[in-house]
């Protein structure tokens, strides 16, 4: 059977960055891997960031769009059926940051997928710089995406102050208690290390971490209404201008609660990727891109954000 690993995590936690490293480890171990990318919105930016991994032993499939639950399940099921025919021995799925994890388990239990796939590891990426105060909906998603994880992998630990990562795990455990889940994470359930220092032994630990059977009380809300994804194509702005716009959007409440700004910008000699959260903005070169900026958050003012992005 093909082993499926799921990498979960709230918006902007660093799932794609970790997935890249994890898949490189799996390929080095001799596995043939297919990545299934499911981004929040109509343009799959994260899949573009992984294109250089494609080769003899690695390929990428995508599901894009904030569609309804039934349509999303149907698309994922169809992708998994087609992937099963292609001879991969490992599949790694990176869902969007507002993914209902139960959807995934339901799909794997369906015929004929239950005969072709086995669930390997559920890996939850949690930002060591996570905001202290989140909305009830965001806290629920944080908890539900980690509840069945075999391991929590902390991101951006090198930027965290002493005690900050531990406080985030306390936050996660409070969020789990808030949805009446018995699961709690302690030191043995968490990998807290600068990702630049991760070893083969660390990735082997991730590979064998498995998953946990758990339950929690669902918070019923429409994730795609609570969390909005706005797309701005061909804004015609420089890297410096987009960086300044992202900084403004993330720190001025008049635009709504902006959680993340990401996208690609032409810089004259090629393309750069911008990835911005409230406490950090990174800009780095990439081989290719599409001129698009995506703003994700809660209660967003589209008109005001478009003015800030386009500078008009």
Whereabouts are the PLM-identified features?
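Nucleotide-state-sensitive switch-loop elements of NTP-binding domains
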Residues: 2-8, 13, 17-135, 140
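Well-ordered beta-strand positions
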Residues: 121, 150-151
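Short, well-ordered beta-strand elements
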Residues: 291-297
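Short, conserved catalytic or adaptor-binding loops enriched in Gly and charged residues
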Residues: 51-55, 145, 181-185
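A short alpha->loop->secondary-structure connector
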Residues: 111-117, 142-143, 169-178
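C-terminal accessory "lid"/substrate-recognition subdomains
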Residues: 151-154, 159-289, 300-303, 307-312
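Helical mechanochemical/support elements of P-loop NTPase systems and associated helical scaffolds
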Residues: 3, 72, 100, 145, ...
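Short, glycine-/small-residue-rich phosphate/pyrophosphate-handling segment
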Residues: 140-141, 148
């Amino acid at each position: 059977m093909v082993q499926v690993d799921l990498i979960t995590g709230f918006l902007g936690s660093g799932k794609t960055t970790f997935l890249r490293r994890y898949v490189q480890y799996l390929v080095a171990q001799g596995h043939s891997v297919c990545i299934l990318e499911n981004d929040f919105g109509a343009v799959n930016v994260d899949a573009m960031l992984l294109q250089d991994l494609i080769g003899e032993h690695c390929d990428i499939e995508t599901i894009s769009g904030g569609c309804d639950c039934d349509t999303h399940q149907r698309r994922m099921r169809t992708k998994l059926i087609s992937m099963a025919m292609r001879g991969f021995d490992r599949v790694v799925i990176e869902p969007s940051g507002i993914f209902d994890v139960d959807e995934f388990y339901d799909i794997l239990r369906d015929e004929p997928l239950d005969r072709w796939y086995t669930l390997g590891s559920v890996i939850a990426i949690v930002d060591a710089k996570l905001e202290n105060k989140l909305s009830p909906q965001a806290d629920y998603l944080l908890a539900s995406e980690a509840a069945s994880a075999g391991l929590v992998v902390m991101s951006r630990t090198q930027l965290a102050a002493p005690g900050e990562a531990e406080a985030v795990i306390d936050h996660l455990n409070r969020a789990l208690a808030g949805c009446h889940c018995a699961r709690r994470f302690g030191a043995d359930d968490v990998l807290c290390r600068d990702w630049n220092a991760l070893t083969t032994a660390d990735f082997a630990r991730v590979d064998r971490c498995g998953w946990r059977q758990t339950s929690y009380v669902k918070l019923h809300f429409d994730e795609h209404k609570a969390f909005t994804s706005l797309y701005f194509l061909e804004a015609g702005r420089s890297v410096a201008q987009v960086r300044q716009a992202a900084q403004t959007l993330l720190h001025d409440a008049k635009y709504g609660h902006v959680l993340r700004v990401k996208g690609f910008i032409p810089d004259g000699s090629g393309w750069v990727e911008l990835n911005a959260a409230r406490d950090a903005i990174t800009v780095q070169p990439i081989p290719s891109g599409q001129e698009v900026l995506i703003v994700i958050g809660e209660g967003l003012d589209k008109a005001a954000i478009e003015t800030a992005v386009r500078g008009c």
